[in-house]
A protein has these predicted regions:
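Ligand-binding face of N-terminal immunoglobulin V-set domains in extracellular IgSF glycoproteins
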Residues: 1
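Active-site mouth of glycoside hydrolases
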Residues: 11-232
Length: 232
């Protein structure tokens, strides 16, 4: 339980350290599935209209849910909470996930009320996500936010970085109102968690200038100065 150690932070040394206990943190956890949040138990979560990839039920981990663990709406969430318990029980201390992947491999996760509505956020879904994130920190799992993925982080595709219109890309990769709102919502709702990393994106292809602007904007918002990283 990270509440016994305090906030995890970068303090200029090789490893992240907890502000309270001073202990070093060596990240050991699952980096897949990136579609961890593509779960049938979350409100407003549906399978991709084009990818035809089924949503996760996390049913095999129902047996790992314990009395007193969170759930919602008459027992929803027990499978995904059980999956976190399992990861913690086998010695993991972190897990990663995409909060947004419209146009990406899974095309089945978004924080909005609708897949194509980047202006309005789904409050009930975000509340349910927060219950999962809270439990994760309580069982000793760091939250690794992969904020976007390779296929939809900008209007450039492939290794050749060909110009293309990517509908899911927030402001086409630039720091416009869509990207600012997205960052503000995630920071406002989730930055209070003690162990958290902001990853600008999985296999990120934004330009260096766009990466710097996005990282700088997140830094200006996050009052807890959580680490900001980049997956190249």
């Amino acid at each position: 339980d990270f509440r016994a150690h305090g906030r995890l932070s970068y303090q200029g040394s090789r490893y992240l350290r907890f502000v309270g206990s001073g202990e070093r943190f060596l990240k050991l956890g699952a980096d897949a599935p990136e579609t961890f949040l593509a779960c049938v138990d979350f409100d407003g979560t549906v399978a991709s209209p084009t990818k035809k990839i089924p949503l996760k039920t996390w049913r095999p981990h129902l047996e790992d849910w314990r009395e007193g663990d969170p759930s919602w709406q008459g027992g929803k969430g027990k499978g995904i909470i059980g999956a976190l318990n399992y990861l913690s029980d086998v010695g993991g201390n972190a897990f990663s996930f995409l909060p947004y992947n419209v146009g990406g491999d899974g095309d089945n996760i978004w924080p909005f009320v609708d897949r194509n509505d980047k202006a309005h956020y789904d409050l009930s879904k975000l509340d349910q996500w927060n219950r999962v994130f809270t439990h994760a920190n309580q069982v000793g799992l760091m939250l690794h936010f992969k904020l976007q993925e390779n296929e939809m982080d900008d209007h450039r595709v492939g290794h050749e970085r060909r110009a293309a219109q990517v509908s899911g890309a927030l402001d086409g990769g630039r720091l416009g109102w869509e990207r600012k709102l997205y960052c503000r919502e995630l920071v406002a709702r989730f930055s209070h968690h003690l162990a958290l990393q902001w990853n600008l994106g999985e296999e990120n292809t934004q330009s260096f200038e766009e990466q710097v602007q996005m990282a700088g904007y997140i830094r200006s918002l996050d009052p807890y100065d959580h680490p900001i990283v980049l997956h190249t």
